[in-house]
């Protein structure tokens, strides 16, 4: 495991470039900072300043090397690098509330933006007019959209929202997409078609994170009632929900076809297993607890605590986990969702951690990624 303390401020969101030599993150304000790996150090290389509201989402397209950002100013920008300088292009989202989340499609020819306007803007480039335009998916969303993930076929889109529901929509755009083949989620896919809807019948909570598996036939989501759920379209959309004893999870990702990693307010990642019988189980916390050591506080730590915790007391308030506050995002760091070797987390403590499954398997007894 490698932990890097980027900031004293929270990291709102992050995205990696293709070869993982650069990371784009937002320090809980209207800017995006791009850090470059230089030996063992991370050095700030660029600052992207165009938004005038808090940035809420960043995604970095690996093949085309474009960054898309969205924010509370109701705007999205596509950033392209020319001669070492990042240039923004405004995207017309046509929303009257903050944008909350953004995600490139697998083919990078469109992206989706969730918002507080109870809709999803699916944006694509119109070459004859030389600008990015959007189409809206509105019905039957009844509240803020918090999370999105694309199906590998570049057409289906999963969305989690504050109306306690997780939904799968068709985001087929005839201008840029080829006619999609039939999937276990359905065969008719006109734009905006609701393919599946889960949750919200009197129970549940805000859906903070969603993730398709590498095959696209499974969908995982985490809700504010501390549940993890997986729907399997290959088993006639069978849903398995696990009520955990932890604080709510905020982000989720498949790391193999049968394994899911989620993290949130408990400050450490958790591993869950979904077997071929459709049974969802909790496997382990993926953190190696540090032994607390009683020691005198240095002057440096005293000043740091004044800054971070508004206290100069020397009582040890450090958590036993690597992250010292809620984890807000989980992303794949090495390989992909089919066979993840390493994953990355960022959190409210301003830290970024890269987790290595090989190291975790050797230090946590009985742990194996299925």
From Swiss-Prot:
Cellular component, GO, one term: glutamatergic synapse
Pfam families noted in UniProt: WD40 (PF00400)
Cross-referenced SUPFAM superfamilies: WD40 repeat-like
Superkingdom of the source species: Eukaryota
UniProt GO BP: Arp2/3 complex-mediated actin nucleation
Segments annotated as WD repeats: 6-45, 50-89, 140-179, 202-241, 244-284, 322-365
Gene3D superfamilies on file: YVTN repeat-like/Quinoprotein amine dehydrogenase (2.130.10.10)
Keyword terms, alphabetized: Actin-binding, Cytoplasm, Cytoskeleton, Nucleus, Repeat, WD repeat
Cell location: Cytoplasm, Cytoskeleton; Nucleus
PROSITE patterns referenced in this protein's UniProt entry, alphabetically: WD_REPEATS_2, WD_REPEATS_REGION
InterPro entries reported in the protein's UniProt record: ARPC1, WD40/YVTN_repeat-like_dom_sf, WD40_repeat_dom_sf, WD40_rpt
GO molecular function: actin filament binding
Protein role: Probably functions as a component of the Arp2/3 complex which is involved in regulation of actin polymerization and together with an activating nucleation-promoting factor (NPF) mediates the formation of branched actin networks. In addition to its role in the cytoplasmic cytoskeleton, the Arp2/3 complex also promotes actin polymerization in the nucleus, thereby regulating gene transcription and repair of damaged DNA.
PANTHER family with a match to the protein in the record: ACTIN-RELATED PROTEIN 2/3 COMPLEX SUBUNIT 1, ACTIN-RELATED PROTEIN 2_3 COMPLEX SUBUNIT 1A
Family, per entry: Belongs to the WD repeat ARPC1 family.
Subunit architecture: Probable component of the Arp2/3 complex in which it may replace ARPC1B.
Protein name as it appears in the record: Actin-related protein 2/3 complex subunit 1A
Gene label: ARPC1A
């Amino acid at each position: 495991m490698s932990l890097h303390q980027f900031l004293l401020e929270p990291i709102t969101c992050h995205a990696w470039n293709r070869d993982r030599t650069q990371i784009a993150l937002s320090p809980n304000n209207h800017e995006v900072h791009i850090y470059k790996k230089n030996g063992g150090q991370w050095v700030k290389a660029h600052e992207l300043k165009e938004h005038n509201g808090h940035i809420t989402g960043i995604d970095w397209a690996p093949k085309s090397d474009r960054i898309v950002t969205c924010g509370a100013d109701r705007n999205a920008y596509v950033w392209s690098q020319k001669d070492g300088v990042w240039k923004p292009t405004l995207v017309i989202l046509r929303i009257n509330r903050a944008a909350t989340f953004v995600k490139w499609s697998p083919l990078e020819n469109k992206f989706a933006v969730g918002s507080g306007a109870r809709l999803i803007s699916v944006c694509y480039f119109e070459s004859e007019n030389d600008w990015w335009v959007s189409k809206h998916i509105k019905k039957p969303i009844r509240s803020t959209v918090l999370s999105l993930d694309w199906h590998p076929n570049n057409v289906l889109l999963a969305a989690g929202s504050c109306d306690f529901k997780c939904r799968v929509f068709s985001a087929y755009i005839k201008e840029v997409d080829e006619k999609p083949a039939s999937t276990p989620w359905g065969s008719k896919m006109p734009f905006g078609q609701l393919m599946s809807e889960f949750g919200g019948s009197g129970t549940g909570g805000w859906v903070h994170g969603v993730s398709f598996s590498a095959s696209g036939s499974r969908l995982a989501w985490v809700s504010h009632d501390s549940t993890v759920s997986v729907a399997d379209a290959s088993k006639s959309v069978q849903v398995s929900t696990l009520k955990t004893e932890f604080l709510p999870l905020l982000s989720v990702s498949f790391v193999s076809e049968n394994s899911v990693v989620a993290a949130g307010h408990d400050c450490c990642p958790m591993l869950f297993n979904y077997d071929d019988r459709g049974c969802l189980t909790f496997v382990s916390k993926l953190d190696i607890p540090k032994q607390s050591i009683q020691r005198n506080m240095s002057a440096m730590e005293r000043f740091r605590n004044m800054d971070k915790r508004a206290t100069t007391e020397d009582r040890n308030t450090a958590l036993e986990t690597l992250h010292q506050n809620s984890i807000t995002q989980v992303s794949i760091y090495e390989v992909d969702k089919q066979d993840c070797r390493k994953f990355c987390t960022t959190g409210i403590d301003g830290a970024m951690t890269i987790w290595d499954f090989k190291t975790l398997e050797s230090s946590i007894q009985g742990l194996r990624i299925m």
